[in-house]
């Protein structure tokens, strides 16, 4: 259950937004990298962030929170713990030790593949899928497809940040996946 954050700001979303550092021209020129490590370093900001997700999903009757490799692994297990549900990792190819299902998706230059253990969830299990941000939506779409192939009901895709100019959240919504993000940044 959510904890009361001492000295919580009146506008928690604006506060979370203010805690995210922008690193210009990283990892390549023209990219404005949205760095969540500054948010994570603040106990107050982390508590408020987790509370926002927990308040949203406390009544969703979830079975699991799935996290996308790698930064989705930071917040998703905390939210799963607070909701008293399991955590399902969706990893880059070759990182899971047991039998897996895989899903490839397109990148700007090439493609990538993510995997899930074939016994990660059961048909009918209710799952949200989490990442740090939604850019093009490719990773979250691949994660959703994997979960659905296992028979899970993917309730929603969730992230701290949306980069709406890159079109990922629109792509996901148009594919039938509801999306929740705490904040958004223009550009890429």
Curated annotation (Swiss-Prot):
Gene Ontology biological-process entries: adenine salvage; AMP salvage; purine ribonucleoside salvage
Key words, A-Z: Cytoplasm, Glycosyltransferase, Purine salvage, Transferase
Disulfide bonds: none
Cleaved signal peptide residues: none
Top EC class for this record: transferase
Role: Catalyzes a salvage reaction resulting in the formation of AMP, that is energically less costly than de novo synthesis.
Subunit description: Homodimer.
Name of the protein in its database record: Adenine phosphoribosyltransferase
Gene name of the encoded protein: apt
């Amino acid at each position: 259950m959510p904890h009361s954050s001492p000295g919580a700001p009146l506008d928690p979303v604006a506060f979370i937004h203010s805690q995210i550092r922008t690193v210009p021209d990283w990892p390549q020129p023209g990219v404005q990298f949205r760095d969540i490590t500054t948010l994570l370093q603040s106990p107050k900001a982390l508590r408020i962030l987790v509370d926002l997700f927990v308040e949203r999903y406390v009544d969703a009757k979830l079975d699991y929170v799935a996290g996308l490799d790698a930064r989705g692994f930071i917040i998703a297990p905390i939210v799963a713990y607070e909701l008293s549900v399991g955590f399902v990792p969706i990893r880059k190819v070759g990182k899971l030790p047991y039998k897996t299902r895989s899903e490839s998706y397109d990148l700007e230059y090439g493609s990538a593949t993510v995997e899930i253990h074939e016994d990660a969830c059961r048909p009918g299990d209710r799952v949200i899928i989490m990442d740090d941000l939604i850019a093009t939506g490719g990773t979250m779409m691949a994660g959703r497809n994997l979960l659905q192939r296992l028979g899970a009901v993917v309730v929603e895709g969730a992230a701290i940040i949306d980069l709406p100019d890159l079109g990922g959240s629109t792509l996901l919504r148009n594919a039938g996946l509801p999306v929740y993000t705490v904040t958004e940044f223009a550009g890429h």
